[in-house]
Swiss-Prot record:
Its cofactor is Mg(2+). This is Inositol-tetrakisphosphate 1-kinase. It catalyses: 1D-myo-inositol 3,4,5,6-tetrakisphosphate + ATP = 1D-myo-inositol 1,3,4,5,6-pentakisphosphate + ADP + H(+); 1D-myo-inositol 1,3,4-trisphosphate + ATP = 1D-myo-inositol 1,3,4,5-tetrakisphosphate + ADP + H(+); 1D-myo-inositol 1,3,4-trisphosphate + ATP = 1D-myo-inositol 1,3,4,6-tetrakisphosphate + ADP + H(+); 1D-myo-inositol 3,4,6-trisphosphate + ATP = 1D-myo-inositol 1,3,4,6-tetrakisphosphate + ADP + H(+). It is an enzyme of class 2 (transferase). Residues 117-325 form the ATP-grasp domain. It comes from Homo sapiens (Human).
Amino acid sequence: MQTFLKGKRVGYWLSEKKIKKLNFQAFAELCRKRGMEVVQLNLSRPIEEQGPLDVIIHKLTDVILEADQNDSQSLELVHRFQEYIDAHPETIVLDPLPAIRTLLDRSKSYELIRKIEAYMEDDRICSPPFMELTSLCGDDTMRLLEKNGLTFPFICKTRVAHGTNSHEMAIVFNQEGLNAIQPPCVVQNFINHNAVLYKVFVVGESYTVVQRPSLKNFSAGTSDRESIFFNSHNVSKPESSSVLTELDKIEGVFERPSDEVIRELSRALRQALGVSLFGIDIIINNQTGQHAVIDINAFPGYEGVSEFFTDLLNHIATVLQGQSTAMAATGDVALLRHSKLLAEPAGGLVGERTCSASPGCCGSMMGQDAPWKAEADAGGTAKLPHQRLGCNAGVSPSFQQHCVASLATKASSQ
C-alpha cells in the first residue's frame, strides 16, 4: 500500500470542532508516513489553487444546511466546491453532496430504507412506519397516522438530521400529546428494544458496532402518560445515566444484531447513495428479534472506533486502486464517475474487523437487472411490495440507479 499511495494528495475540509474531536491531525500524519500529502482546504479560496487532489474528505453538513437557507456565503462555498468536483471527475469525493443532502433529511433517508426493504427479502429486518408532519395537527392527523401504520407511542424527530436541534425528540403517548409537536417533523413508531442501541460506524467496506444506552420499554397502545421530551445525544452517550434508560426488566427477545444483516444493510446504503462514511442506528425489536434502522448519519463521530484512521486509509487505497484499474482497462475518464459512485472495487484493502463486500461484488453485478420491481395501483401510482428488509447477495446497479435518481437527485435540487 505504501508504494501505491506515495505521491497521492488528499484534501480535507472539516470544522475545527470535528478536527479536534477526531484528532484528525493524527490521520494526516499517518498519511504522510505513507508518502501522501495532506492538505487542509480553505473554501474561501479557489480549490483549483490548492490542487491537484486525488481525494477529498469533507463534512460540509453545516455549510449545506446554511446554503439551503439561502445564506450567501455558504451558497458560494458549496458552489465553489461543486464547481471543482465537476471540473475534476478524477477526484474521489468522500462523500457526494447529493447523498449528503439525502442523509440530512430524515424523511428522505427513511424513505430510502423503505425502498431497500421493498427490494430485499429477509424477515430479520423491519422498517418502522413513519410519516412527515408538515403542518400543525388537525382533525385529519389521526386518520393520516393510522393510514401510515403509526400507533401510540411514537417518537417525534426534527426533519433535519444534523445539528444540535436534531437530537431534540419526543415520545408521544396519546392524541393530546400531538398538540405540543412543532412541524415540520418526522414521526416514527416507537419499538421496544430493551434500552439498547447499536451504533454501526461504517468506513467503506469496514464497520464497527458499538453498544450504547437507549430508551426503556413502554407499553404499546394509547396511554394517559404525558409526552416525554429528551435529547437523544445525552440519552445514548456511552456513560449516560438517565431514568429514561433504566430498564425495569428485560422483556422478550434480547440479542445482538446479526453481522450478516449489518453487512447487507451497509452495502445497500453504500451502493444506493455512493457513500462511504456514515453511521446506522439499529435497535432489536424485543418482540420479534428483528433489526430496525431508526436513523442514518453522515460522517458520524466514530466514538469507540479505535481503528478508524486505519480503516479510512485502507478505504482510500481501495478506491484509488479501483479507479486506477478502471482507467487502465478503459482509458475513459467518464467511467471514473461510476467507480466513485460504487466505491467498492474488488480485491481492495479492507479494515481489520469486518468486510461487507464479497469478492468481486461490484464487477459481478454489472449488467444485471434488479429483482426489485415497483407495483402500480389502479391510479398508476408506484407502490412498494409489502416485504421485509433482507439480505440478498448484492445490490444491482439498476437498484442503485433507481435510488440515486429518485432520492439523491431530488435532494440536490432543493
